[in-house]
Amino acid sequence: MAVRIHFTDDDLAQIRLAQAPDPMWEALLSMHMLQTDTASLVFGSWRNVVRHQLTRPTGELLRLAPPVGYSADFLTPAAGAGGLDAGIGALLSTPRQRLGHDLDELARAGRRLPSWARLLADGDKGAVTHLGRLHRHYFATALAPWWNRVRTRFDAERATHTRYLADGGLGGLLNTLHAGIAWRRPVLEITGLGIDRDVHLDGRGLLVLPSYFCWRHPTLLKDPTLPYVVVYPMAHETALSTAPGLRSLNALLGRTRAEILETVADGGVTTTELAHGTGVAAATASHHVGVLRKAGLLTTCRTGRAVLHTVTPLGLALLDGRA
């Protein structure tokens, strides 16, 4: 199964790489991570701090963003690209029809909604204001103290893919975003989402958005009529911890190879970037990549002047089983 995004010539001229992290998307996806215990290597310390500090009323916001399945589309308005104030302003201006539609979607999925959800679905001004207040408090608690780190990683990710665009054109950009994203002009195919769908942009263009809190697989809005965005996990510079699952992966692959597999899973990288990220010599990184490639966990391809390593479905399955 795959989501196939079909481009017209007009769409191809309107593919954009986001200029800055989107606080609304980071809020939504961090809510997902807060409700799981996966990816402790990257998010474990953050999760422990935020769970301790988050107030119960603000925690009700998480009911609109379950970690599996549908989350309310209205939580990530396109205006979030302009910053937190713009995003919350758009959230407060969400049409009543959109609020009702998205909350009905959650209810049909059997989600337990906050006590104020019915008022929100009716467009009650007090409930909408309450939603905006909770969202702002959530950002202040869960994201603001870490926002410089999010921005630094975003800038590095954007610089990397800007280089791929310059070296390999549109294919150089789209084919290096994530192992589950493939560009076969004029169709962008995204796998690993558990859905099968064809989306025709019809001149709307596409925003490509790296996300710090997006984990393992890309994500999309459910409603294909909204401004279209593909959100994908940005690369993380991580240090291995002593988490039980991670110790098992270390025992299976070895510490350095496990770290290389983790790094490559977040997006295509070069041998030099792997060497820098893992603290080993380029020749050593190249050797480990060769071993992982022979095991079917990684693949290597040339895009423009860059030779990129990406994780295979088998490699992702191994990591998913470990997470």
Segments and roles (model prediction):
Residues V150-T152, L173-A179, D196-D202, H276-G279:
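A generic short-segment signal for beta-strand/edge and adjacent turn/coil regions
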Residues M1-I190:
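N-terminal, charged low-complexity regulatory/assembly segments
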Residues F43, P66, D104, W147, ...:
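Generic preference for flexible, low-structure residues
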Residues L207-A323:
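Extended mid-to-C-terminal alpha-helical interaction segments
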